Structures are given as C-alpha cells and as structure tokens.
C-alpha cells in the first residue's frame, strides 16, 4: 500500500535496452516498489532512456535518491544515473487553495465547514470588494499538502452552489512566480506583443506544448488530404518564395488578402475550381519570383478585385490597400500572404518569418483600438478548458495566420474562465482554415466547437 506522502521519482540516464523487469533489481533494494514505468514515445513506442518510479514508502525514495543520484553509471552509459523527484512533485509543499464559483451569500464559516472534513485549516478567507460584497471566491490554507490535494480531488467540479454560474472550482493557488508570469503576459498582450517565442515561457507552457504537438499532427493529416490540389510546380514556387524572403525580403511586394472566393472538399475527389487571372503581360517583371508570377498589379487609389495566381490551388481574391505602405512593411506583409496563397506547400517548409515585427504593425490610434477583424475573419471557440487564458488560445490559433486579437471570456465577479473565447484574423482564409482544423479538436475531455462569428449588422463597417 502506498503512503499518502510517497514521492514519485524521475529516473534518467538508463540504457534503452533495459525494461521494467531489468530495472527492478536495481531499485527494490531500497524498499517495496509501488510502480515502475519506463517512458516510451507515445507515437513510435521507442524507449526514451528514462522512467518513473514510485515506492510504497517516502523513506525508500529518499534512500534511493541519496544512494544513486549521480553516484552510479549503468553499463553502456556515459553519464551517471539521475534519480530525483518528478516535476509533478515540485508543488509538494503547496497547501493553499483557491476556491472559485462560490455563492455570493457564503461566509468564511460556510467555506470552512465545507473543507474542514479534509484536514486542519490554518486560514479561510472569502474575498470581498470595498463595499463588503463577496467576490464569489476564497482562499483556504491547510496544514499539509496531502490534505489540500484530498480537498481538490473530492470537491473540484463536484457541485454547483446556489447563486453560482458554474461548478465549484478548487485548485492550488498560484505561486508568486506564476502570478508574475501572468502579469507579464497581460502586459505583453496589452502592448500587442503576441510573439509565440515569448509565450513559451508562460505558466502553462508544458500544457500548451502538448496541445501544439497534437495540433501539428492533425495539421499534417489535413495537408496530406489537400495534396491532390498541389502540383510539383506549386511546391517549388513556395520553396523559392521562402528562400527569397530569407535572402532579400525587401524585394517582395505585399498584397493583402481579404476573402476566400470558394472552399471545396479536401478529400481529393472534387474538381478544383477554374482560375481566372490577369494576362501575364500585365504583370511587371518586379513581381516575378525566379520566373513564377506571384501577384498581379494593384492600384493604390481605388479598391479592385483581382485573382492571385495559385497554380492549381483555390483562388484567393485580393484587394488593393487604401493607403500606400512603406516598402519594408510591404515586404513583411507579402511574406504572410504567400503563406495564404500556397497553404499546403508553405506548411511543408519552415517559414522565415512567423509575423512582422511589432514596429512594422503600428497603426493610427483609431485602428489600434479595433479588436475585431474584417467580416468573415472572426471566430468563436466554445468548450475551452477551464485553465485556458488569452495566451493559450492565441498560441493554439497562431499557426493558421496573423491573429489580430485572442480573448478568453472571464467572469468579472470570480475572475474564472467562462470556457469560451473569440479569435480575430486579418483574412477569411485563416479563419476558415482554423474552423476546418479545430472544430471538433479534442483537448483532454473537451471537444472544441469552432464557428464563424455572425455580425450583428451585416452592413457594419470595420
């Protein structure tokens, strides 16, 4: 029987030819083993050279760590074995809980009675506003981590209290480090610093990495399904465009894409739409990419609708910009829109620039306040996990195009997610790609519902 305070150990630097039965004699000399699992790649089944080990007694784990960690090198290995508490044990000293979705009428004493069956409580405080009104949440601090964990296991999501809009939330309170990271993310979002590199340092980076891995798998399947419309010449053109973007970005002229002309089945059995294009003679030589005509000319005075050459892919009509952009800004914008013109081909190679630098996307003050994209570019996402924030939803949808804004709706009283959000792209192509790939996408026990936002007024200008 495992003790309540038993420690889960991470074992590293073990030979890949050793499985559980081979490792057991090494570790059982320190005590009875509750669980020993070699870590394998979930897709290939290959041994990853490490394992998780849990003893029945906490004392056994401490003895094994003291005797083995960097003290012994197993046959065939260059470095000594690693024996240390797993990352999941790093919160072992946490005793303070955040309790959300309380009824407004519940007092400190009511909350204490709810939790006292799980152990001795040091602190219990319902959060209140300046006028003394409950905010619908509280902090509860137990004497031990085990008691706090037992309360989470028993109460989280178990009931909906009178006056609450959702089921009870019970989780460990954020550490000071996590609160600092959350504040940094909020500041970054307000400044428009939506860099996917910065998001890797978020409080939930491990969680979002798992989501990202699953997303990449689904996208790969989608690209394979759409490859019937992708001929070798289109692939070559996409690769050459990327090379040119890397070497000389200023040589590419931007063409903002505002709408998809048609969307057809990606099964490979339907007939690609007929393309109409401006005669080649009307396209200036400066727009050629190694002999491939990429984007037709545009007027900067009056909007016009012309077809972009897509070489066998679905056509993407383009509209000319209202105001003249500086060449460097045009260059960065142009690279993004080549991605839209050749989605499947471009996905096969690593993009040189994921998005233009913040300094290039500065807009007049009246445009900076605009948080929605043009009509047909805004999507709603339902059934999000409770712990998802703006950063997670942004990182999830960045692969589909340039995101103008990403927002998870939060209950003002409890500061808890309402489990739905809103994402705006700068072109309908990205929005439709996101809907096709992410609608029905499963995260844990949740299956996302992703759909296009319908404007309240179809004639509303953006």
Swiss-Prot record:
SMART domains: RRM (SM00360). It is found in: Nucleus; Cytoplasm. Signal peptide: none annotated. GO terms for cellular component: cytoplasm; nucleus; ribonucleoprotein complex. Its main location: nucleus. Keywords: Cytoplasm, mRNA processing, Nucleus, Repeat, RNA-binding. GO terms for molecular function: mRNA binding. Residues 7-88, 95-175, 377-455 form the RRM domain. SUPFAM superfamilies: RNA-binding domain, RBD. It comes from the Eukaryota. Pfam families: RRM_1. InterPro entries: CELF3/4/5/6_RRM1, Nucleotide-bd_a/b_plait_sf, RBD_domain_sf, RRM_dom. Gene3D superfamilies: 3.30.70.330. GO terms for biological process: mRNA splice site recognition; positive regulation of mRNA splicing, via spliceosome; regulation of alternative mRNA splicing, via spliceosome. RNA-binding protein that may be involved in the regulation of pre-mRNA alternative splicing. Belongs to the CELF/BRUNOL family. PANTHER family: RNA BINDING PROTEIN. This is CUGBP Elav-like family member 3-B. It comes from Xenopus laevis.
């Amino acid at each position: 029987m495992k003790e309540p305070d038993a420690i889960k150990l991470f074992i590293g630097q073990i030979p890949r030819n050793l499985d559980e039965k081979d490792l057991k004699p090494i570790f059982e000399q320190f005590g009875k083993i509750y669980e020993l699992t070699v870590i394998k790649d979930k897709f290939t089944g290959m041994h990853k050279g490490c394992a998780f080990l849990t003893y029945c007694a906490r004392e056994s784990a401490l003895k094994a760590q003291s005797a083995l960690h960097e003290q012994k090198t197993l046959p065939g290995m260059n470095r000594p074995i690693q024996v240390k508490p797993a990352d999941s044990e790093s919160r072992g000293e946490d005793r303070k809980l955040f309790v959300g979705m309380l009824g407004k009428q519940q007092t400190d004493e009511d909350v204490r009675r709810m939790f006292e069956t799980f152990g001795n409580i040091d602190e219990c405080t319902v959060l209140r506003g300046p006028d003394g009104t409950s905010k619908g949440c509280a902090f509860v601090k137990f004497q031990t981590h085990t008691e706090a964990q037992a309360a989470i296991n028993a109460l989280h999501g178990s009931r909906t209290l009178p006056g609450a809009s959702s089921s009870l939330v019970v989780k460990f309170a954020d550490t000071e480090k996590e609160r600092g990271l959350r504040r940094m993310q909020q500041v970054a979002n307000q400044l428009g610093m939506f860099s996917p590199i910065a998001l890797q340092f978020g409080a939930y980076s491990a969680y979002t990495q798992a989501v990202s891995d699953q997303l990449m798998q689904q996208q790969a399947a989608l690209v394979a399904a759409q490859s019937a419309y992708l001929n070798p010449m289109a692939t070559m053109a996409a690769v050459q465009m990327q090379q040119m973007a890397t070497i000389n970005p200023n040589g590419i002229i931007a063409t903002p894409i505002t709408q998809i002309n048609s969307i057809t089945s990606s099964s490979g059995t339907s007939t690609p739409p007929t393309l109409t294009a401006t005669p080649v003679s009307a396209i200036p030589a400066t727009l050629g990419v190694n002999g491939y005509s990429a984007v037709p000319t545009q007027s900067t005075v009056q909007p016009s609708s012309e077809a972009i050459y897509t070489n066998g892919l679905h056509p993407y009509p383009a509209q000319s910009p209202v105001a003249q952009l500086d060449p460097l800004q045009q260059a960065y914008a142009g690279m993004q829109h080549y991605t839209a013109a050749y989605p499947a081909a471009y996905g096969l190679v690593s993009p040189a620039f994921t998005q233009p630098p913040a300094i290039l996307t500065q807009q007049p003050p009246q445009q900076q306040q605009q948080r929605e994209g043009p009509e047909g570019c805004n999507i709603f996402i339902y059934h999000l996990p409770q712990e998802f924030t703006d950063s997670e939803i942004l990182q999830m949808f960045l692969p589909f195009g340039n995101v103008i804004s990403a927002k998870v709706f939060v209950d003002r009283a409890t500061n808890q997610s309402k489990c739905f959000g809103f994402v705006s792209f700068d072109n309908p192509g990205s929005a439709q790609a996101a809907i096709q790939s992410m609608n029905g996408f499963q995260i844990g026990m949740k299956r996302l519902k992703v759909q296009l936002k319908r404007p309240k007024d179809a004639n509303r200008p953006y």
